[in-house]
Amino acid sequence: VILHAANRLHSIALHNILILPDFYLPGTDTKINPFAKVEPVRSVAARIIRLREIGQTIGEIAGGEAVHPSNPRVGGMYRNVTERARMKMFDLAKEGRQLATDQMEFMIAILRNFQKRDYCVVGNAKVPMPKELGYHNQGYMAVDPMYGTNSLAEYPTWQPQRWAESRPWDWYMGEMEIDFEDPSYPIGGTTKKGGKANPQMEACTGVPTYDGQPVEVGPRARLVKFKGYDEKGTVGQHIARQLEYVDCIYAILKSLDALNTSGKVLADPIPQGDGSMGWAANEAPRGTDVHLARVKDGRVQWYEMLVPTTWNFPTCSRALTGAPWQLAELVVRGYDPCVSCATHMIVVDDDNRIVAQKLIQ
């Protein structure tokens, strides 16, 4: 739980940096540049950076690596932390408590200000702001406020029999001609007209459903399922994420208080598997992350991952329905999708000199 909450704390702070340019300083028509050297933005950026440092440091102390650890230990951890390390994590979490509260309140104020606006400037256009931006009527899926569940739990909160998966070919539209372009759209204009797009062929993930329908996973889903949260739309999604700031800190403090630094860290024995399916559903920062496997005699026979962004893609497409196309990116960023928004490709020669580069979006 400590590693998990630290990772989520770091993720929320990073997402703040990504979304702040979408919004305005209250009382102005000035969009926020999180890297500007003027107040209040400079202090906000410093706070975000410190929250990321706190999350990463606690994660490294507790689990060896904060994000995407390269050497996981099946069945537990390699070693326990020392009492000194436990107290270090306590100190970091206590420092983060006020920072997280301040950042949560700042972000909610920014979001509420944006919600009151009549328009948003994108490129050279004043785009009317729909009051129902990002709304959808899909359900929500979450298995735990902070951690997760699995097939060995007495009362598992996820059921594999309710899950199904479709091919992109069966879900998305076929080939269409691009017949519109806007060179003023940031950055560098939209895709040139005259080309073709084919989501059926270009989509690279399956389409998972739960009870036959796409679902939303992530911060809002957790708050809907476990805390009675009910705000819809893109702003509601962003606010839900900010509300998890303080949850992360208190989850860390509570777990550190209960941590026995002399306790066992590895399951004994570790089952070698009989070929039947087992699964675990974990609440990652972006949402429910389900791993399913069949293991027999210590060897993996079959493995499948249902990651948060895969769950959210079809729901996000429903949330985009009816939105001004200029605000589509804003809606998508509410889901914090784990995909590359752009790839900076460089070509170097034998002397490591850049001979060509291109930004692929």
Which residues fall in each region the model found?
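Active-site bordering "gate/hinge" segments
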Residues: 1-286, 296-297, 309-361
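Short beta-strand elements
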Residues: 289-307
